[in-house]
Amino acid sequence: MTSHSDRPESIPATSDAQPSAARRRLLYAGVAGAAALGGAGLAWWKFQPHAMEQGVEEALWAMEFEKPEGGVVALKSLAGKPLLLNFWATWCPPCVEELPMLNAFYRQQAQNGWQVLGLAIDQPSAVRKFLQRIPLEFPVGLAGLGGTDLGRSLGNLTGGLPFTVVLGGNGRVLHRKMGQITPQDLQLWAPLR
């Protein structure tokens, strides 16, 4: 005698059945969401300053850079006071946009001991031409492509610009920022020593 439950029409559907359209949409949405989160996380990580190379702070203060107008700027001459070190280039729109703000910060904070040094990752002739059009009150050093290596040693692994490093009067890195600075950044940094 066969039981009623042995009939094929009474056997429940197995997992071999096709998922419904609603389930497929949920599955696709979940996969797309996970991919978006992963991509956003990777982008965030890539543009964060990373660990600095060992001994870079000490080596930094021994460096000298030619100035566009002639002569050299020695970082050791800037030691003992807070320093905003900005890596920039004439061909970098966010760099050019933030320079007037950096110039105003320098003007306003110099009496509080602040110093600003711009390190141009650029050809000397391009920097000279640029500074004739847009003069800056703070000193500029011609870092060339070697400035990219210095930025990397300070934690800018992508070599992106602009890149800003804030150093305290004791010579230690207090803050690093990859990307264009904001007025809020400068307000946050101004009380640092």
Predicted feature descriptions by range:
Residues 1-22, 32-37:
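N-terminal secretory signal peptides
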Residues 30-62, 129:
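N-proximal helix/coil linker or "cap" segments that precede and/or mark the start of modular domains
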Residues 62-82:
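A short beta-strand-turn-helix
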Residues 63, 87-88, 130, 138:
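Conserved hydrophobic/aromatic "anchor" residues
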Residues 82-83, 162:
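Alpha/beta-hydrolase fold active-site loops
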Residues 86-92, 121:
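Aromatic-flanked redox-active Cys/Sec active sites in thiol-based oxidoreductases
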Residues 96-135, 145-152:
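Structural microenvironment flanking redox-active thiols in thiol-disulfide oxidoreductases
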Residues 133-136, 144-191:
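Thiol/disulfide oxidoreductase modules built on the thioredoxin-like
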